[in-house]
Amino acid sequence: MFYYLIAPLKNKTPPLTYFSKEQHPKGALVNIDLRNKTLLGVILEEVSKPSFECLELEKTPYFLLPFQIELAAFIAQYYCASLSLALSLFTPFKKCDIAKLEKIEPDLSALSQTQTNALNALQQHSISLLFGDTGSGKTEIYMHLIAQMLEQKKSALLLVPEIALTPQMQQRLKKVFKENLGLWHSKLSQNQKKQFLEKLYSQEIRLVVGTRSALFLPLKELGLVIVDEEHDFSYKSQQSPMYNARDLCLYLAHKFPIQVVLGSATPSLSSYKRFKDKALVRLKGRYTPTQKNIIFEKTPNFITPKLLEALKQAIDKNEQAIIFVPTRANFKTLLCQNCYKSVQCPFCSVNMSLHLKTNKLMCHYCHYSSPIPKICSACQSEVLVGKRIGTMQVLKELESLLKGAKIAILDKDHTNTQKKLHGILNDFNAQKTNILIGTQMISKGHDYAKVSLAVVLGIDNIIKSNSYRALEEGVSLLHQIAGRSARQISGQVFIQSTETDLLKNFLEDYEDFLQYELQERCELYPPFSRLCLLEFKHKNEEKAQQLSLKAAQILSLCLEKGVTLSSFKAPIEKIASSYRYLILLRSKNPLSLIKSVHAFLKTAPNIPCSVNMDPVDIF
């Protein structure tokens, strides 16, 4: 008999011992009985025969690869989650016949001398940051790196934010890597996922392009991971375990012979600080040089005569425009002009957004909706006005001002399926659309030859927010959106902001901003300090507060040297009827943070809380 310690998947139960008449390797997936249910579990290790009676396991053809087991253990430790939960993230491997590995002869574009120098520099490091201006040709460098890896009969992974998986990018990669390319994202059907995995098991797919969950796929002989748009917040999971896929890639490179390249036109301040003196590869200028004129308009209004004229000129020249708006719907909030009270969600401490198309107010946190009121509930005034314009309102106003113009929207409300997303982008690429209005989705990796005008509205709402990353997020967005225009023809960038004097300093070179921000960023925040956020919530506000107070008392006894603690009500006090209290831990040493949290979780296992290591924001 053989005895094994097994972690049940998708279950909070700690590892348990089972027996088998056969020997099994570490990482094998097996069926186990637990509380009258059959669950999948992962073999962690072989153990001695215990003193108690055990149930028998049942083998399956699936198993986790060594790098997956190593990564799961790190996730559990660093992000303070159960090992079972961490292992549940991974897709297992299945033995099958290996497809004949054909010699790959990709049809690659020749690199410029600048790109060749960057490629050679990247090859000198196992971990590096490719800091390349928008339009400088980062994707061509990625493709050369990937081709070299596939020629060595290894596999490669290109991680991208969800929206960056555009039809354009897919066609570009498909043309070069043909049947060796596989795409992985959240909108694949179960049948599509099954077909993808069969090709991955047989190693017919050797290049995976996907969103953050693609990191958990069973990629055999993984030799290269590229994290494009490494600054993007979507690499950070907001559900436990709250991992950051970018940071997990860096860990993989330290433990396995895997090359990792982070890429961005606007790298995060943390990555810039980490790499600036060692493995930062700078790629300046555009691959196709064009002229770009930047216009600032210091106004609180939106569709101004000056902006309208710029849009008309672009359309008259048979060119295209993109318009960034930070808010979807018609307006961010509905405000009474008499008592200045806004309409709040009854279940969340946030204002409800105005959606005129459905004639409803909607909460973008819990999705509660209600009819648009005709009078103010506080003072009975009938003068209710929408504030903070959204994508739908910009569309509505432009349709009345630009008769005959073809205008589309790219936001979460309009791209709930892959088909809709591709339809919007394909129409814009085919120039069936004159103007594309969008939220942050519009800033991600789109490359359209006829875009001569990029418009930025409402950027002040981002740079004046309470986040410690507010200015970084705002300036990064400006560069990303500005980079969508004048890629192959000359054009202009139109920015509405009251902070023109500040922003003008940073629009030539993003590195100027990064150096400025390194001087200005408070040392209590990343990249100078590490943070860990603990959230306590309850339907009863008093009980939520008591949970956090009790936790703070216990935590204060568990803190390692150099760790500080602050406890407070969450900036958004209530979400989905649950009141929220936060504890923020700070330290220069991440190991001290991790030890402190693990000690607390061990001491107070009955206090429910969620742990967010390295949060991207505090809300």
Regions inferred by a protein language model and the residue ranges of each:
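Accessory, non-ATPase domains that flank or precede helicase/AAA+ motor cores in DNA-metabolism machines
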Residues: 1-264, 270-272, 276-288, 448, ...
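A general secondary-structure junction signal
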Residues: 45-47, 91, 325-327, 411, ...
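Inter-lobe coupling/hinge segments of SF2-like helicase ATPases
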Residues: 127-150, 154-206, 210-543, 582-583, ...
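Short amphipathic beta-strand starts and helix->beta connectors
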Residues: 514-522, 559-571
